[in-house]
Amino acid sequence: MQKRVVILLLDSFGIGASEDAKDFGDLGANTLGNIAKACFNNLADSNDRKGALKLPYLESLGLGLSALKATNELPLGFESKPNLIGAYAYAKELSSAKDTISGHWEMMGAPVLFEWGYFKDKNNSFPKEILDEIMRKTKIKGYLGNCHASGTEIIKDLGEKHLETLYPIFYTSADSVFQIAVHEEKFGLDNLYALCEEAFQILEPLKIARVIARPFIGANREDFKRTANRKDYAIKPHKKLLFETFIEEKQGEVISIGKIADIYAHVGITQKFKAGSLMELCDVTLEQIKNAKNNSLIFTNFVHFDSDYGHRRDISGYANALEYFDARLKEILDNLKENDLLILCADHGCDPSFKGTDHTREYIPVLFYHKDLQPAFLGKSESFADIGQSIAYFLGLSPLDYGKNLLNFKGQP
């Protein structure tokens, strides 16, 4: 029997502080719960949306019930007895970090049980010898930033000076990351990508998970904005991924939409499609669901929940984007084929109501839909790897080293 898997990952969509949140300074974080609370109390009203958070299709897959199991609290405005069509669980992260790469790798069978390298100093964040080597190897004459920063704020603060000098802007965050912002037209995309490649080679021995190209456009601080030509340079996964097993054992197609290919350093990816906005990500995902052949795994990362709303602590924007996604989810459900397995999940939290601008250590929702799957609670997962192990079971692949299968199909041999 030919099968397909569709994974929709809502980047940063946590459902409540996990039991180890205190170790990360994240007690009280709850991305979904705090957005729902703000909406219910009319604190997230805008020209685009008003009132309680309305996510009927996500609720039908078990989102609210998953959050209830994780936190003992139903998100405000959610149904206690929705018309349930999906099977649901919630998962804690086994990996040592709360970043994008750790979450994604873990769910495909490669939890990060080592410590990434970090730049912990808020100012003068990068070692001088590293900066000197980057300058020597790339021939840049100087740099700006060298600090922890919000990506949107630092281009406002330093973008005009960058245009005067063409010095790239270097910055980091609480994640294992080295980010480089330049003007896409004045500095040039090819020059930015070449700079990032050199920086990645220099930083890889320090276990810095990613170097990220962050191009922007505009003439002054009032109109600087980032473009869709972001590119991530990631360390290769340290363990074999589910993707590779699928290709080896079933000659499967692994279709990346959005930044998935970059996150996995292009390991085990057979096709990739870029998209610049939440609408485009939904459009391309729907197109692939309609057209991808059997024996395919379609994997989309919906990055804007994290980059545009979580990190920017924009509760109303996050809520509006969720409601837009939920409306598009109806289209996705309507276009699934007979034997498709749909999975909705996240990679970490990024509570827009929480202090700071960083990710938050939270449980994630794990929601499944398949015509032969009984709507039910599937339990608490001790690792995101249960997602990959469940996919391996569904596709008839060799088991992963981590995780347990959550699925039990009606009439499956």
From Swiss-Prot:
Protein's UniProt keywords contain Cell inner membrane: no
One Pfam family linked to the record: Metalloenzyme
Recorded metabolic or biological pathway in which this protein acts: Carbohydrate degradation; 2-deoxy-D-ribose 1-phosphate degradation; D-glyceraldehyde 3-phosphate and acetaldehyde from 2-deoxy-alpha-D-ribose 1-phosphate: step 1/2
Enzyme Commission numbers on file: 5.4.2.7
Enzyme superclass (EC): isomerase
Subcellular location as annotated: Cytoplasm
GO molecular function: magnesium ion binding; manganese ion binding; phosphopentomutase activity
Cofactor(s) named in the record: Mn(2+)
Entries under NCBIfam families matching the protein: deoB, PRK05362.1
Function: Isomerase that catalyzes the conversion of deoxy-ribose 1-phosphate (dRib-1-P) and ribose 1-phosphate (Rib-1-P) to deoxy-ribose 5-phosphate (dRib-5-P) and ribose 5-phosphate (Rib-5-P), respectively.
The name this protein goes by in its record: Phosphopentomutase
Species of origin: Helicobacter pylori (strain HPAG1)
Gene: deoB
